[in-house]
Amino acid sequence: MEITVSVDVSAVRALLNSQSRRINLAMRGGINDATALLLRDMRTYPAQRPGSSYQRTGTLRNSWSRRPPQGHGLDMYGVVGSDPQIAPYNAQVQHPELQAAVHVGRWQTTETVTNLRRGLVQQMFDDRMREAFAGT
């Protein structure tokens, strides 16, 4: 046994369609804010181990980049990624499932950064939407 309730969302759909420019601007701003933050976090190296003579090259840092926002409206998305052509070892350092034991607990993974920043990223989008629709 079940109850089905249907509602007419045409007014909401019309409102969203009439506000597509504002939605696009807010989404683009939120994506730019979020990808800049995540890129910075993924490029951040932990402190070097005391007594280590290894000279860091910055190659892993330089392998990380972000692409401009893709898509349209509420389907817009951003991408932050590490290029394995630049740093072939990137997964052994920052991939949550492939990280080498020597790096566990020292280097942030994509998963730890995602979990750490989820709330702040949501706040960035909320702020951009509020800003886009202020006064309407």
Task: Pin down the residues of each PLM region.
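Protruding loop/beta-arch "assembly-hinge" segments enriched in small, turn-prone residues
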Residues: 110-136
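Disorder-to-helix initiation segments
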Residues: 1-21, 106
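Short, low-complexity, charged/polar segments at coil/turn and helix-coil boundaries
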Residues: 14-100, 123, 131, 136
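Short helix/strand-capping connector loops at secondary-structure junctions
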Residues: 94-113
